[in-house]
From Swiss-Prot:
Molecular-function annotations in GO: RNA binding; tRNA pseudouridine(55) synthase activity
Protein name from the UniProt record: tRNA pseudouridine synthase B
Annotated active site: D39 (nucleophile)
Classification lineage: Bacteria, Bacillati, Actinomycetota, Actinomycetes, Micrococcales
InterPro entries: PsdUridine_synth_cat_dom_sf, PsdUridine_synth_N, PUA-like_sf, PUA_sf, tRNA_psdUridine_synth_fam2_C, tRNA_psdUridine_synth_TruB, TruB_C
The EC number(s) this enzyme carries: 5.4.99.25
GO BP terms in the entry: mRNA pseudouridine synthesis; tRNA pseudouridine synthesis
Length: 306
């Protein structure tokens, strides 16, 4: 049975669910999931799990993400991106690059962000975007996010300077809305702003260099096998033959070297445990003087792409 991660370069106009559907056909299995949605207008890294690798997706969802984006200053839209109707315009002609960089700096670090009202967040059991489309004025609560990096690469005047297109790179915590960053940057500068382009270049340890288009994957289904995926994602622990046997039966073993320290493996941040042959045996959490399995992966002879 084929199991592993597929790093897809999602095309513009496709929903994440569309990509999952296509992968189900390519992989010949219904058991395919993704590690965090990407808006239809966005392109770039979408991490999919096939069969047993779907169990790794929980640990990928919460990792940091990196994006390249273009923010247009001078116009606000109902969706905070280029797909929505323009609801206000204010000339950005007087906005300097220095002012932009200062506003960007204020949006870097740990901030409170109000998600875009046109989002998949549920409000009383209904998606926020559905409420907005029905004419409701939706107000979402602010939530803490971390902007690790917010770099300005270029500022390009358009329409005789009435709008400014700002090319940026953003590295951020899971749950950050880049559309909301564009909106908030525009509000801070008094011009309004929205997102016109978005490309995700990294999810956790998985990068655009590893990603393949759907066309490429239709020709050759490149799968990052389980042990490689887990080695890149979390701390590693090498097991002896006896330890691997004990863990494969769900039994506990001696705790890892980091037990009792802030680096100790936990259920939320486990260590990947490998047999002497390099195969992924389990995910482990330290508990006192012992390590216990959080997830156990049955041994298999699967080969990626076979």
């Amino acid at each position: 049975m084929l199991s592993g991660l597929v790093i897809v370069d999602k095309p513009q106009g496709w929903t994440s669910h569309d990509v999952v559907g296509r992968m189900r056909r390519l992989a010949g299995t219904r058991k395919v999931g993704h590690a965090g949605t990407l808006d239809p207008m966005a392109t770039g890294v979408l991490v999919l799990g096939i069969n047993k690798a779907t169990r790794l997706l929980t640990y990928i969802v919460g990792t940091s993400k990196t994006y390249t984006a273009t923010i247009r200053l001078g116009e606000s839209t109902v969706t905070d991106d280029a797909e929505g109707e323009v609801v206000s315009s204010h000339s950005a002609a007087a906005v300097t690059e220095g002012a932009i960089r200062a506003a960007v700096a204020a949006l870097t670090g740990e901030i409170q962000q109000v998600p875009s009202s046109v989002s998949a967040i549920k409000v009383n059991g209904e998606r926020a975007y559905a409420r907005v489309r029905s004419g409701e004025d939706v107000k979402l609560a602010a939530r803490p996010v971390t902007i690790h990096r917010f770099d300005v690469h270029a500022v390009r005047p358009e329409r005789a300077g009435a709008v400014l297109d700002v090319d940026v790179t953003v590295e951020c915590s899971s749950g950050t809305y880049i559309r909301a960053l564009a909106r908030d940057l525009g509000e801070a500068l008094g011009t309004g702003g929205h997102l016109t382009a978005l490309r995700r270049t990294q999810v956790g340890p998985y990068t655009l260099d590893q990603a393949r288009t759907l066309e490429q994957l239709a020709e050759e289904l490149e799968v990052l096998e389980m042990s490689q995926a887990a080695r890149a994602l979390m701390p590693n622990r090498e097991l002896s033959e006896d330890e691997a046997t004990e863990i494969s039966f769900g039994r506990r073993i001696a705790a890892g070297a980091g037990a009792g320290t802030p680096e100790a493996a936990t259920a939320d941040n486990p260590a990947a445990a490998f047999a002497p042959d390099g195969s992924l045996v389990a995910l482990l959490a330290d508990a006192g003087g012992y390590a216990k399995p959080v997830l156990v992966f049955a041994p298999s002879n699967e080969q990626p792409g076979k």
